[in-house]
């Protein structure tokens, strides 16, 4: 039986590349994305067209903030791994619309953690951000550096998701890996990162 992987944010830049890599290796992937309009939705649609060429890929449009919808889809698919990359991105936009960050990044991640706990996921991987290092003056950053002073609302939500994930991992023994992405660029990248 093929390993099943559930990827949130699968139409996003990082999610697309992760999904494609696992599909190319023969895994079954269920992708979820809200297809929000933070940047041109056509770019997300074009990424999805490529993923949909794989017979082992299925996609559902939806929000991670909707736990009933999310739980229904995840339980039906029954993955052994969840890769949680969905998030409201962008530091500048977090000043204009902090509610979007609270809902997507914190509530959405809480929902992913709850579902991971309920289905006893074998491994949970969560995308975070280098912005959690905030006002840290030491350079270059290391994983062991302090992350106590975020300087944007976006960074504060990403640090909050790390804390929630650590708590869930400790309390319910959910094997969890958190990845702190720095500026990510490449083919099919976000236009605001150019």
What do these predicted ranges mean?
Residues 1-184:
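N-terminal Rossmann-like NAD(P)+-binding domain of SDR-like oxidoreductases, especially those catalyzing
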């Amino acid at each position: 039986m093929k390993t099943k992987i559930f990827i949130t944010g699968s139409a996003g830049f990082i999610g697309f590349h992760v999904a494609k890599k696992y599909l190319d290796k023969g895994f079954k992937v269920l992708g979820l994305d809200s297809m929000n309009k933070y940047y041109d939705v056509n770019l997300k649609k074009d990424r999805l067209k490529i993923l949909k060429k794989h017979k082992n890929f299925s996609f559902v449009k939806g929000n991670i903030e909707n736990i009933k919808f999310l739980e229904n889809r995840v339980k039906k698919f029954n993955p052994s791994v969840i890769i949680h990359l969905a998030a409201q991105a962008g530091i500048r936009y977090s000043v204009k619309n902090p509610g979007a960050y609270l809902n997507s990044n914190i509530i959405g991640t809480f929902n992913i953690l709850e579902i991971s706990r309920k289905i006893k996921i074998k491994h949970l991987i969560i995308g975070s951000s280098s912005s959690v290092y905030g006002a840290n003056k030491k350079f270059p950053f290391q994983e062991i550096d302090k992350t106590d002073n975020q300087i944007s609302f976006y960074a504060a939500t990403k640090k909050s998701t790390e804390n929630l994930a650590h708590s869930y991992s400790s309390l319910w023994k959910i094997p969890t890996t958190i990845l702190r992405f720095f500026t990510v660029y490449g083919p099919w990248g976000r236009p605001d990162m150019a």
